[in-house]
């Protein structure tokens, strides 16, 4: 199996690391690639940083109108090759083709927003702020920036950062997850066609050694990360200790509240899509479904909807849910289901160890539903990152808000209702960075920041939109005095 190459300084280069790890199709366990993994990947990082640092001085001087021109072409190339990239995502990540296509569309939307950088970078000016004095603020790029990407959205999440960073005048390095490196390889085949100076955008493969090399290199000025809370905390602490600007998106345990006045059919469809879409492997997946009052009807409807969901290989257009990423992930999810039963929960729908014809070795779990779990138990409070729904019954909206705000995470909270008063109360009081009203996946569009609170985010500025512009630039305030007359000249 050929080892995937890095892309450094505008050239495809072989890694200095001889040890490799296989890239596995999670539906079949077929080996579909290999990436370098080991201490010598730090040498690859050094080469990528040198290339990016070498390109920065000239790239930052390119007018912003010129810097965004390659992004227009990148958008067109992504649109042209969207189906090919989507199929690659499905092969290595496991999600359905429909989900993979949607992922690429979100990537394209971020490129479109970044194309507006000539306006987004406009700053502030105050004329005659004091007699004869003008004051203004300018934005300048940071230098070499890097993205450490997760496995679950290999085609989208790097685009929360990449187009904004280079449009602001920075140079960039992407380190994809070693589990799903093929998607970025496809993207970089398109980047290679852009009219960009060598070293502006670079790709390096690897694992923890690669990450640590990026966190420790003095010429890397900013780090963007998305992944688990445990790793996000590590990235933030180590990056900040080395003087870097860091944004680190962590995990989640997302609650959805359903009031008695909610539209039944709409709520059921949207909630089941949120819980089981992408096999539950997304940081905005609903997990704890809270019904206010006795709502046996919606519980039955959720059960029937989940039970009918088709599970299988994502390239089959009829499939509605694919596998989870690794056997270890499946084992962890199954352990948490077992734990829920041990905690006194009732298993309404058991998705463990399904038989998927033709894909018996795949990492499959069918939709699973638990109810009656203790509110302070491990399963209710732990991010499962799999297709598991926990049903909770509470008496009032206030009780639901108290429960939501007692959690350690704060990525998303959603409410289903036809009451404007309850919607306004919920969006004001729920302690989460992304709020959905009659929405099951409150994913911000590219113009808005992907906001996480509490242990779902470490940092100050998020990805996407204006937050990305602020993250990838530093401000400089200039105060100028221009007297009408000079009393003396040297």
Indicate where each model-derived feature is located.
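Hydrophobic face of amphipathic alpha-helices that form TPR/SEL1-like repeat modules
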Residues: 1-34, 352
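Residue-level signal for inorganic ion chemistry
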Residues: 10, 29, 67, 89, ...
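Residues at or immediately preceding the N-termini of alpha-helices
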Residues: 26, 42-45, 64, 82, ...
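Conserved C-terminal structural/oligomerization subdomain of aldehyde/semialdehyde dehydrogenase
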Residues: 28-35, 196, 220, 257, ...
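Glycine-rich loop-to-alpha-helix module at the N-terminal edge of alpha/beta enzyme cores
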Residues: 32-121
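Short, well-ordered beta-strand elements within core beta-sheets of diverse protein domains
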Residues: 33-38, 54-61, 147, 256-259, ...
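Rossmann-like NAD(P) dinucleotide-binding subdomain of oxidoreductase/dehydrogenase enzymes
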Residues: 123-269, 303, 394, 459
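ALDH superfamily catalytic-core signature
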Residues: 230-374, 398, 437, 482-489
């Amino acid at each position: 199996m050929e080892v995937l190459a890095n892309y450094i300084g505008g050239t495809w280069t072989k890694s200095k690391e001889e040890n490799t790890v296989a890239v596995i199709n999670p539906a079949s366990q077929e080996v579909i690639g290999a990436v370098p993994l080991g201490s010598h990947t730090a040498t690859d990082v050094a080469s990528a940083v040198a290339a990016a640092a070498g390109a920065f001085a000239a790239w930052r001087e390119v007018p912003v109108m010129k810097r965004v021109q390659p992004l227009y072409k990148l958008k067109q190339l992504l649109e042209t090759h969207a189906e090919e990239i989507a199929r690659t995502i499905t092969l290595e990540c496991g999600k359905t083709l429909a989900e993979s296509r949607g992922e690429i569309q979100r990537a394209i939307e971020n490129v479109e927003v970044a194309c507006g950088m000539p306006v987004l970078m406009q700053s502030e000016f105050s004329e005659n702020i004091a007699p004869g004095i003008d004051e203004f603020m300018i934005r300048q790029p940071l230098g070499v920036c890097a993205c450490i990407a997760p496995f679950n959205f290999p085609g989208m999440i790097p685009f929360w950062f990449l187009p904004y960073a280079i449009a602001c005048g920075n140079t960039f390095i992407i380190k994809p997850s070693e589990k799903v490196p093929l998607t970025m390889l496809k993207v970089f085949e398109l980047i290679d066609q852009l009219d960009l100076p060598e070293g502006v955008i670079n790709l390096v493969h690897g694992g923890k050694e690669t990450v640590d090399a990026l966190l420790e290199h003095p010429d890397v000025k900013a780090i963007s990360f998305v992944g688990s809370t445990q790793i996000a905390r590590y990235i933030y602490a180590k990056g900040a200790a080395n003087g870097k600007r860091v944004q680190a998106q962590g995990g989640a345990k997302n609650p959805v509240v359903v009031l008695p006045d909610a539209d039944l059919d709409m709520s059921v469809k949207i909630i089941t899509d949120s819980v089981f879409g992408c096999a539950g492997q997304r940081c905005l997946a609903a997990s704890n479904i809270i019904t206010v009052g006795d709502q046996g009807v919606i519980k039955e409807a959720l059960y029937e909807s989940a039970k009918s969901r088709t599970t299988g290989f994502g390239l089959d257009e009829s499939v509605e849910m694919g596998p989870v990423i690794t056997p270890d992930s499946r084992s962890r999810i199954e352990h948490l289901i077992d734990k829920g039963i041990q905690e006194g929960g009732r298993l309404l729908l058991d998705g463990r160890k399904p038989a998927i014809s033709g894909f018996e070795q795949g990492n499959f779990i069918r939709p699973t539903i638990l109810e009656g779990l203790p509110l302070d138990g491990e399963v209710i409070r732990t991010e499962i990152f799999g297709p598991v729904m926990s049903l909770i019954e509470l008496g009032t909206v206030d009780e639901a808000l108290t429960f939501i705000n007692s959690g350690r995470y704060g990525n998303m909270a959603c409410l289903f209702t036809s009451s404007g008063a309850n919607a306004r109360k919920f969006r004001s009081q729920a302690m989460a960075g992304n709020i959905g009203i009659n929405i099951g996946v409150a994913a911000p569009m590219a113009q808005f920041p992907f906001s996480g609170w509490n242990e779902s985010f470490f940092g100050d500025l998020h990805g996407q939109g204006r937050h990305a512009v602020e993250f990838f630039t530093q401000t400089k305030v200039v105060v100028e005095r221009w007297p009408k007359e000079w009393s003396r000249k040297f």
